[in-house]
C-alpha cells in the first residue's frame, strides 16, 4: 500500500486560477495579496502576465462558484482558489448567499475532479473580515497553501491511477466507476 501526501515545493509547472468577488473588495484584495505572497514564496509566479496564474474578477461571492466550475471544466488548472467575503447584515440574505456559495464551490470541485478551494470569508462583522484578511492573520495565505497541497496530491493520485492502469490494464478496485483523466457523475457521491 502507499501513502499519498501533497507537497508545497513541486510548483512547476502548476497552473492555478483565482476567482475573486469584487463585493467587499476592501477584504478580498487583502485576501488576494496574502494568496499571491504565499504563491510567490513557494515558487509560483503570481504575475497576471505570466503563465502560472489566471485571475478572474466577478461581481460578488455568489457568482464565484459558477465561474470556478466553468474554469475547472477546462481542465487547464491544477487548482482554483475562490476568494470572497460575505458579511452578515440585518436580513437573511447572508444565510442564503453563504449556503449557496458553499454548496456551489463544493459541487464545482466534486463534479470536475479539480481542487476548488473555499476561500470565502463568512463573518458577522467587517472587523472580523479584516482580522482574517491581514490584521491578525491573512487567510489568503492559507487558501494558497491548500491549493498547492491539493494540486500536488491530485497529481500524485492521478499518476498512481494511470500507472496502475498501465501496469494492470484495469483501474484499481478502489475506483470502480472512475475513468482515466476525468471523473464521471457515477464516480462521485455528493
Swiss-Prot record:
Keyword Membrane on this protein?
A: no
Highest rank taxon of the organism: Bacteria
According to its UniProt record, the EC number is 2.5.1.78
Query: Keywords on this record?
Result: Riboflavin biosynthesis, Transferase
Task: Please list the GO terms describing molecular function.
Answer: 6,7-dimethyl-8-ribityllumazine synthase activity
- Reactions performed catalytically: (2S)-2-hydroxy-3-oxobutyl phosphate + 5-amino-6-(D-ribitylamino)uracil = 6,7-dimethyl-8-(1-D-ribityl)lumazine + phosphate + 2 H2O + H(+)
Does the entry feature the keyword Transmembrane helix, yes or no? no
Q: In which pathway does it act?
A: Cofactor biosynthesis; riboflavin biosynthesis; riboflavin from 2-hydroxy-3-oxobutyl phosphate and 5-amino-6-(D-ribitylamino)uracil: step 1/2
Q: Where is the active site?
A: 93
- Matching InterPro entries, A to Z? LS (IPR034964), LS/RS (IPR002180), LS/RS_sf (IPR036467)
Q: Matching Pfam families, A to Z?
A: DMRL_synthase
Residues that coordinate or bind 5-amino-6-(D-ribitylamino)uracil: 23, 61-63, 85-87, 118
GO terms in the biological process aspect are: riboflavin biosynthetic process
Write down any Gene Ontology CC term: cytosol
**Residues at which (2S)-2-hydroxy-3-oxobutyl phosphate binds:** 90-91, 132
Q: What does this protein do?
A: Catalyzes the formation of 6,7-dimethyl-8-ribityllumazine by condensation of 5-amino-6-(D-ribitylamino)uracil with 3,4-dihydroxy-2-butanone 4-phosphate. This is the penultimate step in the biosynthesis of riboflavin.
By sequence similarity, the record places it as follows: Belongs to the DMRL synthase family.
Please give the name of this protein: 6,7-dimethyl-8-ribityllumazine synthase
- Primary gene name: ribH
Amino acid at each position: 500500500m502507499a501513502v499519498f501526501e501533497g507537497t508545497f515545493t513541486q510548483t512547476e509547472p502548476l497552473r492555478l486560477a483565482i476567482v475573486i468577488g469584487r463585493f467587499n473588495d476592501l477584504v478580498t484584495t487583502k485576501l488576494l495579496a496574502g494568496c499571491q505572497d504565499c504563491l510567490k514564496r513557494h515558487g509560483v509566479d503570481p504575475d497576471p502576465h505570466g503563465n502560472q496564474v489566471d485571475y478572474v474578477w466577478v461581481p460578488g461571492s455568489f457568482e464565484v462558484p459558477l465561474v470556478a466550475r466553468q474554469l475547472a471544466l477546462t481542465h487547464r488548472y491544477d487548482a482554483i482558489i475562490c476568494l470572497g467575503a460575505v458579511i452578515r447584515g440585518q436580513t437573511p440574505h447572508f444565510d442564503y448567499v453563504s449556503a449557496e456559495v458553499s454548496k456551489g464551490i463544493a459541487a464545482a470541485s466534486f463534479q470536475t475532479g479539480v481542487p476548488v478551494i473555499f476561500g470565502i470569508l463568512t463573518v458577522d462583522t467587517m472587523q472580523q473580515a479584516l482580522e482574517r484578511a491581514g490584521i491578525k492573520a491573512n487567510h489568503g495565505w492559507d487558501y494558497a497553501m491548500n491549493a498547492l497541497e491539493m494540486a500536488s496530491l491530485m497529481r500524485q493520485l492521478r499518476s498512481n491511477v494511470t500507472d496502475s492502469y498501465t501496469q494492470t490494464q484495469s483501474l484499481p478496485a478502489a475506483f470502480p466507476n472512475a475513468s482515466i483523466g476525468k471523473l464521471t457523475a457515477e464516480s462521485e457521491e455528493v
